[in-house]
């Protein structure tokens, strides 16, 4: 064939149109993606592509030689029946549709029972709050397979109360080599470096990165459930560290499907509202549950009624007849004495305004606080420093809370083998879980792991 300028014009056979050409010609993908497409409920996110089904007024033209255009306004007003559109008409490759259909065909709820005896790996064990939290969960037995603890005082306590394998250092390579596989991993990683009362060094403190070794174990062992705990300030002042932990957990892949292995969620819970204990203790809880080719429906435990402080105090304690008795027998230390005086003044003011006797209340006051830290209805947050110093006093009884009372305010059993001093057990309780909160979370985790809602 010759062109108008006399030169031969090369001719070629028209290429066969492939599926990808048809997909590229679809109006669903040719139109630019504007913000309105993301707001419509008909927008579909699939395989990383944002797809918008074609409008009823759009007409898909299969030929590539003609331009796609909207029908003019002069077209017949009679509404046409909308034709059923196949997958290729939405601009999605057939392979993508097949993979998506296979994933959507998986059951959203599938019962995969946990073993009757759930083995537990305890990190940063301390007082073994994880062990005592799971003892009363109905329908399941929890057996601690190992614990990891570096503090010598805590190790002494653990050896007297848990007859299981113990490891000294989570950073020791022999730990990762020798630690057995478990169904459930739990750990309250060191909080001093993230606490509002500490130096707030975060991951710049060597203790701030110890959680990484727990995550390495999770990556290698792939337990069915993981529960982490730390102070609320982790979410407030160290949010980047919290995000890193969540990202690492979400990035762990299932070796069979190469998809994310865990459902991950976190929430701040208060022991007073979610543990039924009059103890104002807010903590961040991070939950991870193995998906095992199904969707996880985990529901955080809701608020429950709180018991009264009087129910947790020793019954043999005798209340003072008047605060004048306490004013004549003040504790040692200028700060402690000032806090007692201010607390008594506040209690008397409240009693006068409510028309009650001043000894009607059971106030608990922190003697070592620079500002008055007292409550008539609950225990202020127990920390390691306050627990070690036995700083919390029952004002109505004129003395510090006993070890048994502190155990009850953390929902621990009181029949433990206590082979350390009262100051040491108080400091350990300041670092411990509130057992009733952890128990309720674990119950929900087991239900979600088995596909029960």
Predicted features and spans:
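Arg/Lys-rich, intrinsically disordered low-complexity tails that mediate electrostatic binding
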Residues: 1-47, 51-86
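Conserved alpha-helix/loop element of class I SAM-dependent methyltransferases that forms part
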Residues: 106-107
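Core alpha/beta nucleotide-donor-binding catalytic domains of modification enzymes
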Residues: 111-225, 232-240
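Short, solvent-exposed loop/turn segments at secondary-structure junctions
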Residues: 127-128, 190-194, 232-233, 274, ...
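Class I S-adenosyl-L-methionine
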Residues: 173-182, 192-381
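C-terminal target-recognition/interaction regions appended to catalytic cores
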Residues: 338-453
């Amino acid at each position: 064939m010759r062109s108008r300028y006399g030169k031969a014009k090369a001719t070629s056979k028209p290429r066969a149109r492939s599926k990808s050409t048809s997909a590229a010609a679809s109006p669903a993908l040719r139109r630019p993606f504007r913000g309105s497409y993301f707001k419509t409920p008909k927008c579909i996110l699939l395989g990383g592509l944002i797809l918008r089904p074609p409008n009823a007024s759009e007409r898909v033209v299969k030929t590539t030689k003609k331009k796609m255009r909207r029908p003019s306004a002069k077209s017949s007003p009679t509404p046409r029946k909308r034709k059923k559109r196949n997958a290729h008409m939405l601009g999605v490759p057939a392979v993508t549709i097949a993979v998506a259909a296979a994933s959507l065909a998986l059951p959203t709820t599938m019962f995969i029972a946990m073993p009757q005896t759930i083995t537990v790996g305890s990190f940063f064990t301390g007082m073994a709050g994880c062990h005592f939290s799971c003892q009363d969960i109905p329908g399941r037995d929890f057996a601690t397979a190992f614990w990891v603890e570096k503090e010598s005082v805590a190790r002494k306590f653990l050896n007297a109360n848990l007859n299981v394998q113990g490891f000294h250092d989570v950073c020791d390579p022999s730990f990762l080599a020798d630690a057995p596989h478990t169904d459930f991993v739990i750990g309250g990683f060191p909080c001093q470096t993230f606490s509002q009362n500490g130096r707030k060094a975060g991951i710049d403190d060597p203790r701030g990165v110890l959680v990484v070794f727990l995550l390495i174990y999770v990556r290698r062992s792939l337990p069915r459930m993981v529960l982490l705990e730390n102070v609320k300030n982790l979410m407030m002042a160290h949010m980047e560290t919290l995000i890193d932990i969540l990202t690492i957990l979400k990035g762990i892949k299932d070796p069979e499907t190469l998809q994310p292995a865990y459902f991950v969620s976190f929430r701040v819970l208060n022991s007073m509202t979610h543990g039924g204990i009059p103890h104002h203790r807010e903590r961040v809880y991070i939950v991870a549950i193995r998906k095992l080719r199904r969707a996880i429906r985990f529901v955080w435990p809701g608020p429950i009624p709180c018991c009264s402080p009087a129910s947790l105090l020793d019954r043999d304690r005798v209340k003072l007849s008047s605060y004048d008795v306490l004013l004549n027998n003040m504790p040692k230390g200028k700060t402690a004495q000032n806090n007692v005086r201010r607390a008594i003044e506040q209690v008397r003011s409240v009693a006068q305004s409510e028309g009650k006797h001043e000894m009607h209340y059971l106030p608990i006051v922190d003697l070592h606080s620079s500002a008055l830290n007292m409550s008539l209805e609950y225990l202020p947050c127990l920390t390691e420093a306050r627990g070690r110093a036995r700083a919390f006093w029952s004002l109505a009884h004129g003395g510090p809370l006993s070890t048994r009372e502190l155990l009850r305010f953390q929902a621990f059993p009181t029949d433990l083998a206590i082979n350390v001093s009262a100051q040491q057990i108080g400091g350990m309780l300041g670092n411990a879980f509130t057992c009733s909160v952890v128990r309720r979370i674990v119950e929900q985790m087991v239900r979600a792991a088995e596909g029960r809602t």
